[in-house]
Amino acid sequence: VMIAVGGLTRLTDSGLSITEWELFTGILPPLNNEAWEKYFSLYKEIPQYQLINNDMNIEEFKIIFYWEYFHRILGRLIGIFFLFPLIYFHFIGKINNKHISTCYLILLLIIFQGIVGWYMVKSGLVNNITVSHYRLSLHLSIAFLIISMIFWMILNIQNNTFKKFLKYKKDNFFFNFLVFVIFVQIILGAF
């Protein structure tokens, strides 16, 4: 869901509509006209508005704002819904020791993903009308890495095995190569 929301945020050119990274205070959207005017005036200061969207009104701005807002809220929720169960199940001993380091690595990647997301947005706030494609591809790569690691761990748990993530075997060369090519093709979509 998050990758789809991120993709739609990009396709609707909504990613630069929120020009500040308010990690804790940005949880609520603007609730009155004054707050909307504040966010809209901040958007008016960036090149995307000045060069492309200078005829945009506040109602049109609200549409792109909500795409980016939902993307950020969903990211926060994913982080929270991963963090608290992880701590709880680790504390009561329900996570197999073989998987605990992978779980915490996924948590760190989720946090890093948020930081990279803001780093990506910053690239589009000055001198550009879009974000850096390199930063976008990094953001997308981390998303696919997180999803792949979670999927891999689910398969390990279902099959009661512990196989290392991205373990290379000569007899799996074609499969590994195919996965690599698909991954590269997806990342090239950022360009």
Regions inferred by a protein language model and the residue ranges of each:
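Interfacial segments of alpha-helical transmembrane regions
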Residues: 1, 98-107, 164-184
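Hydrophobic cores of alpha-helical transmembrane segments in multi-pass inner/ER membrane proteins
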Residues: 78-84, 140-158
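Individual transmembrane alpha-helix segments
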Residues: 42-80
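Long, glycine/tryptophan/cysteine-rich extracytoplasmic
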Residues: 25-47
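Transmembrane helix-loop-helix
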Residues: 77, 81-108
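N-terminal signal-anchor transmembrane alpha helix
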Residues: 1-26, 181-191
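Juxtamembrane "helix-exit" motif on the non-cytosolic side of transmembrane helices
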Residues: 119-127
